[in-house]
Amino acid sequence: LVFFTRSLYDLITGLLDQWIKRFSCGEMQYDPKTNSKLRVFHAWGAKEQPGLYRIICEHHGKRPGTVQNTNERQPNRGLIDLSKRLLEEITIEPMFDAILIDEGQDLVAEDDLKYQDKQAIYWLAYQSLRPADSEHPEQKRLIWAYDEAQSLDSLKIPTAPELFGIDTNLNKAVTGSYKGGIKKSEIMRRCYRTPGQILTSAHAIGMGLLRPEGMLTGLTNQKAWKEIGYEVVGDSKFISGRQITLRRPPENSPNPISEIWGKPVLEFETYGSRQEEMKALAEKIMHNIVHDGLNPSRDILVVILGSTYEAMELETQIAGFLMEYDIDVYIPTALKLNDLVPQYPNHDPDKFWHEGGVTVSRITRAKGHEADMVYVVGFDNVARNENDVNFRNQLFVALTRARGWANLSGVGSYPMYEEMRKVIASGESFTFTYKRPPKRDIGDSE
């Protein structure tokens, strides 16, 4: 089982243990230290924590590359660069029976890093697999899951043609059904974690559906919208100048919090200064802990938006401010609470939560995690770049970490703030004018 965000180890091993116990009626459990047949890896790997790329290198007697061995600045592009080089240097021998890839959208890059028109990491994984059927050696157990709306770096979507290029046999491998009727591709239209009001708002603001200049990214046909849980009201086709109405039926958002709570579960507030924003944040978190009975760790999460530099700076600033309010904080990878700048070697890259502290995290480490109450801070860092799809994806990822409630805040005044207010006011139905094809059409699924 492979994933990209290293801080997910605790969550994924916990879920494996939970569901193995469930399906074995308590007779089996998962312990990563003793179970050698089911391995959990992050995609890259390190000396103290094996990963897919590193394990494959070592199996073939090759020295694994590190961040120092690539000129790529983004971690995922660095890994893809090294995977491409490995494929160019050696022939990969089969060593696994099955590979399941989560966060598949983070393991693709632009065409300049492809290996023979294929996405390098996926081809590396495919080559390292034993055939599932000796008579059909091209059939291998490579399973990947992705959410294109959560891509923070690349606009590529991990469809079979994108991953495997012009190889028609592999492209057909994910179409149709297996014997017995099991679909080879499954699109999840129902969301259990995030309340409907938050999910629809995250989709709308992430895609820019109510953006005055027109949507930036999204789907442009009824079938594709239906597949992710929406209805296109009427017989509307996505033609320039035509009005489109989308609705998400309640059965596709079964999280009951909105109905039980009876009040908005998504709030958006703006402030005249960062100081005001942080003061309001501290007071709300203190109220959650003292009056609402939420635990600081795992129940509450603060997610920081912005570019790498902006988010790092704001993360430290907000964590320090919360400490002044006697709120213990945890910065992911730190070995203890209230360590605002954890650094190698005194850090733990696998760690995201710490008992007794509110986790304050940049979006890249928050991916995959969830909490009852999520505070999304620094909306202004996105609003200044409102026509950037990756920045909007940050907003989508941050809001959908919420199991119950989300609070979004920013400073200053930007046109995107008014767009957000319209999104929230629209509820679970959106009406907009389709103006032109989006920068990124994510409806090209298999």
Please state what every model-predicted region is.
Residues 154, 159-200, 207, 213-220, ...:
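Core RecA-like ATPase module of SF1/SF2 helicases and allied nucleic-acid translocases
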